[in-house]
A protein has these predicted regions:
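Short beta-strand segments
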Residues: 51, 72, 132-136, 198-204, ...
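A short amphipathic alpha-helix within small helical-bundle interaction modules
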Residues: 4-7, 18-21, 25-32, 37-40
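A short acidic Gly-Thr/Ser loop motif
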Residues: 10, 71-76, 200-204, 222
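ATP-binding/phosphotransfer module of carbohydrate and carboxylate kinases, centering on a glycine-rich
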Residues: 63-130, 140-143, 161-171, 183-193, ...
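Short loop/edge segments at beta-strand edges and connector loops
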Residues: 173-175
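Short hydrophobic alpha-helix segments
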Residues: 93-95, 150, 219
């Protein structure tokens, strides 16, 4: 116990315990506190005084930190993370969305997940400056209302207001792909550039746009619907009602449909059946990667076609925006190898105007699932500056 390193370790333990036990004025160290700790624990007075001082230092340091909670809300899971000012993730929490429940119960689950992240960080709720959330579907970031989230079957849900009522913490909302793009821009693949477009390929396809260092929302807050660029006029019907959208050609749902059709209607043999336990209704990105690695001809052909149309989509974005960087992310991109990215690049160059791709970097996302929570925390801090 005479080792100062040991004293520091004990101080870390006691920093929270002391305040919980009633040492409210812990930052004003006195002999009274040391004597009380001695009486409570039986340790020597000198050691008690050192522990109190170490706890004081730790509490003061924690008080000076400015924490926010970033949340990535999806149709299947909710991720929450307590994040320090420098972007360091201090704690994480995860729970199932249970989207079949009514909005009030799902919002309760979001609030519980946030509280769990705060508790895991060893912080009190009043240490959290704000909560930032990335949510699916068209939404109004100013009022914090989800206009329509098809995966949740939500219409006009005032998520910001409902969470602030439950948490008593300022809460800010933006589109999930926007916050993922911001995360990559500030702490991931996009660091050091001034303009970029994030294209995220998963169940659907979404995009986020950074221009002159700022997130671009558009006039009615719907900028970035890259999944609905038309890349094949006579292509399959998209959920939006149009035909030949990028999402209808290259999303995971589109990939699944094409593989299923090849196997069931054309009688093609594929390892996918074995790898996915015979299920052709939903094929996960990891399974696609395994099939490609195994040399599965059906999957490889479909993924080559997928890359082609993603390349055409990238070319369209570069033609009209010409950003410094295109960041490709999402489950489908993250699961596949560099050959997939190179094929996207090949078709982007082929379909872009001459020289338009010069100097435009096509990069892959670096942050994975953390992009959403980090981006949400960044936007929350920005809103704090402009709102309060």
């Amino acid at each position: 116990m005479k080792d100062l390193t040991a004293i520091k370790g004990v101080g870390e333990f006691f920093a929270k315990k002391l305040s919980q036990a009633g040492y409210q004025s812990i930052t004003n160290v006195t002999d009274v506190h040391a004597k009380r700790l001695q009486a409570d624990t039986g340790i020597p007075l000198l050691i008690a005084a050192r522990i109190i001082k170490e706890a004081q230092s730790l509490i003061a340091e924690a008080d000076s930190e400015k924490y926010v909670v970033g949340v990535d809300m999806g149709g299947t899971k909710i991720l929450a993370a307590t994040i320090a000012e420098d972007g360091t993730i201090v704690s994480r929490a995860k729970t199932a969305t249970k989207a079949h429940k009514d909005p009030a119960k799902v919002i309760d689950r979001i609030a519980d997940c946030i509280n769990t992240a705060i508790e895991k960080a060893g912080l009190e709720k009043n240490s959290i400056q704000a909560v930032g959330i990335g949510a699916p579907g068209p939404l109004d970031p100013q009022d914090g209302v989800i206009i329509f989230a098809p995966n949740l079957n939500w219409y006009n849900v005032p998520l910001k207001k409902e969470l602030e009522n439950r948490l008593n913490i300022p809460t800010f909302l933006d589109n999930d792909v926007n916050v993922g793009t911001v995360g990559e821009f500030t702490h991931g693949a996009g660091q050091g550039v001034n303009s970029l477009v994030g294209i995220f390929v998963g169940t659907g396809i979404g995009g986020g746009i950074i221009l002159n260092g700022k997130l671009f929302h558009g006039t009615n807050k719907t900028a970035g619907e890259i999944g609905h660029i038309i890349v094949k006029a006579d292509g399959p019907k998209c959920n939006c009602g149009n035909s030949g959208c990028l999402e209808a050609m290259s999303s995971r749902i589109a990939i699944t449909k094409r593989i299923r059709r090849a196997i069931l209607k054309r009688g093609k043999k594929s390892h996918i059946l074995e790898l996915n336990d015979g299920n052709l209704d939903s094929i996960r990105s990891g399974t696609l990667a395994k099939a490609v690695a195994a040399g599965d001809k059906v999957t490889i052909k479909v993924m080559r076609r997928t890359a082609k149309y993603l390349g055409i989509g990238v070319a369209s974005v570069v033609n009209f925006l010409n950003p410094e960087m295109i960041i490709l992310g999402g489950g489908v991109v993250e699961a596949l190898d560099d050959k997939f990215i190179e094929r996207i690049r090949k078709f982007a160059v082929a379909y872009a105007l001459p020289n338009t791709m010069d100097g435009v970097e096509i990069a892959t996302a670096k942050l994975g699932d953390d992009a959403g929570v980090i981006g949400a925390s960044v936007l929350a801090r920005q809103h704090l500056v402009t709102t309060y």
